[in-house]
Every structure is written in C-alpha cells, then in structure tokens.
UniProtKB/Swiss-Prot annotation:
Biological processes, Gene Ontology terms: thiamine diphosphate biosynthetic process
Keywords: Cytoplasm, Schiff base, Thiamine biosynthesis, Transferase
Gene Ontology, cellular component aspect: cytoplasm
Gene: thiG
Transmembrane residue ranges: none
Protein's name in the database: Thiazole synthase
Pfam family for this entry, one: ThiG
Keyword Cytoplasm: yes
Entry keyword annotation includes Transferase: yes
Family in the record: Belongs to the ThiG family.
Species for this entry: Clostridium acetobutylicum (strain ATCC 824 / DSM 792 / JCM 1419 / IAM 19013 / LMG 5710 / NBRC 13948 / NRRL B-527 / VKM B-1787 / 2291 / W)
EC top class named in words: transferase
UniProt xrefs under InterPro entries: Aldolase_TIM, Thiazole_synthase_ThiG, ThiG
Length: 255
C-alpha cells in the first residue's frame, strides 16, 4: 500500500490505534502486531513515569510512533501544558490535541483547539488536532501549521460509524495540504473501509478494538479493512448508475 507522510515521517500503515479502553496493557504488543499500525495514541494521564509496572509505555515498542493526547484538557492552556509535560517525560514531539469542555457529548472545542495548535507548532511540536468536521476550522488549522486534521466520525466512544459522512466528504475534498485522519466513532471494520474509500488518508480506532470480545482479532480485521478501502480508492471505484447496465450482450448470441 502507498505510504502516508505526516510530519516528515513516512508510514506504511494508514491505521492508527488507541489504547484508552483496553482491559489490560499486556495485550498492546499483540494488537499492534496484528494491526500493522505504526502509530499508537496514549492519554498522558495514563503515563506513569514513576512506575515500571503500571507505566503503559513499557508495553509499547520503541519503533512505534507515540502519539500522546491531551485528553482531559478543557481549554487551550491546559492542552499546551499537557503537551509540554508529555515532551518533558520523553514522549517525543508528536501530540494529538483534544480539548473538550462538553462533558455530555464530549465534542471537541474547535476554537480552543486552534489556539493550542498554533502555540504548539511554534514550539516545534508535530500537532494532530481532533476536531468537529468544519471546513473553515480545518483551513485555520492548516494555516497555523497542523500536521494533519482529525475530524470525528461520530461522538467519541460511541461506535456509531460515520454519522458526519457528508461533512467528512467536504474536508477530504477540500483539505489537500495535510492528511485527513478520521477519528472517533468508528465502530466496525466496514466503517473504516468506507472512510478510506471516501479518500480519507487514515483512520484512528480505539473503542471498536478495545471493546471487542477478541481485541487482537479485531485489530487484524481493521488492518485488512483499511488496506481494502485504500486500495479501492486508489483503483477508482466505478460510478453508480440509476438503472441496470448489462455486463454481457443481450442480443445476437442466438443467431
């Protein structure tokens, strides 16, 4: 599969994997192996640098790209502070910005996200912001230096699929300067395949893998779905037609 480039790094997988709801950290190595993913997201609040046993980083291969997120931040200032803590803790300079002040629907605050992104880009971070799929805000994020834009497919953790499909289509069509990574709400492999067929550059999956009866097998299923969806997009899917179109001649073969 063709490579994806973010922040100057080339990736041979277009599936990003989250760790937020896994029953045990011990399953992480197997999930990452079967998913073929090269990018793993971790909530900074789960990184315990004082403990060798409970620190989630101990279960993550050093060859993977660690993408800490600012989960728990309610405004730009808190997100910036969390990003700096992550970098100081040795988590690198990649950061996924999550700014959520809405405790009911957990929808991202685009305004505060843009502020945090602009500040952190100036500090040398590779910033991947999680946002509501709004074209104007996506353009603002590109203008302030975001390395990718990560619009939600549905409310985080809902497993409801691509409920924002029409808005995602607009972003995918109009945002060409940086990758569009569909994040949140993807509930099954077919959702991931659909996002890739639409032209998304990558998808991030967490809850759908973590809450499956067999997370390792589900990770492999998502890997295959992302590959299939990307291949279909590159191959150029045939146009839909309102009426039937015969695949073989209907006349002349009995004469």
């Amino acid at each position: 599969m063709d490579e994806l480039e973010i922040g100057g790094v080339k990736l041979d997988s277009r599936l990003f994997v989250g760790t937020g709801k896994l029953a045990s950290n011990e399953v992480i190595p197997k999930i990452m192996e079967k998913s073929n993913s090269k990018v793993i997201t971790v909530a900074l609040r789960r990184v315990d640098i004082t403990s060798k046993q409970d620190n989630i980083l101990n279960f993550i291969d050093k060859d993977l790209i660690l993408l800490p997120n600012t989960s728990g931040a309610r405004n730009a200032e808190e997100a910036i502070r969390l990003a700096r803590i992550a970098k100081a803790a040795g988590c690198g300079n990649w950061i996924k910005i999550e700014v959520i002040s809405d405790n009911k629907y957990l929808l991202p605050d685009n305004y505060e996200t843009i502020k945090a992104t602009e500040a952190l880009v100036k500090e040398g971070f590779i910033v991947l912001p999680y946002v509501n799929p709004d074209l104007m805000d996506a353009r603002r994020l590109v203008n302030v230096g975001a390395a990718a834009v990560m619009p939600l497919g549905a409310p985080i953790g809902s497993n409801r699929g691509l409920r924002t499909k029409e808005m995602l289509k607009i972003l995918i069509e109009e945002i060409n300067e940086v990758p569009v990574v569909v994040d949140a709400g993807i509930g099954k492999p077919s959702d991931a395949a659909m996002a890739m067929e639409m032209g998304a550059d990558a998808v991030l999956v967490n809850t759908a893998i973590a809450t499956a009866d067999n997370p390792v097998l589900m990770a492999e299923a998502f890997s295959l779905a992302v590959k299939a969806g990307r291949m279909a997009y590159v191959a150029k899917i045939g146009e839909e037609k309102e009426y039937a179109s015969a695949s073989s001649p209907l006349t002349g073969f009995l004469r």
